[in-house]
Amino acid sequence: MALCNLNPTQGIFPLQGLSKSQEFICFSLLQSPRCGSYSSLKTKRFGFCIRSKFSEKEAGKLDRGYVATVNSKEIKKVGKKEHHLWKKNDSAGSGQKALNLVRMLSGLPNEKEAVYGALNKWVAWEVEFPIIAAAKALQILRKRSQWHRVIQLAKWMLSKGQGATMGTYDILLLAFDMDERADEAESLWNMILHTHTRSIPRRLFARMIALYAHHDLHDKVIEVFADMEELKVSPDEDSARRVARAFRELNQEENRKLILRRYLSEYKYIYFNGERVRVKRYFSEDS
């Protein structure tokens, strides 16, 4: 170490190559009174060397601690500035856009060319297809019982390759039922059955059974029920009653009793005040 190169005869410390702490120690030694012997000066010099090393280590620890603190603060600041651009929330204006679409459709004639042309203009300047606004518009039209507009909007969405979901199919089948279009409903149902054979929910089967029962197509009701049996989908209570009624209209009393025994037993279980309770099932004379 440079501090240890002390000339005992001259009493001078060479200051070249020394750190700040070492220079301070050397100046303190020069200002102190001359030592009586070389051994005492050597002992003090050894103590100064140890003290200078200790001060350098402490200074290094302080520097490293300060750098670590600054880096941690910088990391926290960077974390606050992160943005997840891949997360896309529902826009707040989709509801108003749906209302504008419903208002536009209500003022159009019932011609297919006029409706499709207006819908194409509505979506022309959109970067992405406004599927949320279109779905909300379908729900609004359904609540208003504007079944013809529901059919037009749903068909237009499907022609664009959008909205091919079970919810859209359910609304469209209901609109076909209410608008007396059983043939179009059957065509759509056959497409759904061949395309989504293993993923058709029970709600859609119930919709078709209700549609055919509403139009007194009892043989079609039995066909849909046979598809449910093949796909191992259990009918709900209303669907089972309609199937039993269809068997009765077709004079198949044995099958009717089988349906009643399998799916409509004398008792059923319901939940009342958080408890499972067995109650007697009600049977009407039409069942």
Swiss-Prot record:
Record keywords: Chloroplast, Plastid, Repeat, Transit peptide
Keyword DNA damage: no
Major place of residence: plastid
Chain positions of PPR repeats: 165-199, 201-235
KW Repeat (keyword) present: yes
InterPro entries per the UniProt record, alphabetical: EMB1417-like, Pentatricopeptide_rpt, TPR-like_helical_dom_sf
UniProt subcellular location: Plastid, Chloroplast
Extent of the transit peptide: 1-34
GO CC annotations on file: chloroplast
Family: Belongs to the PPR family. P subfamily.
PANTHER family per UniProt: OS01G0757700 PROTEIN, OS07G0545900 PROTEIN
UniProt name for this protein: Pentatricopeptide repeat-containing protein At4g18975, chloroplastic
Species name: Arabidopsis thaliana (Mouse-ear cress)
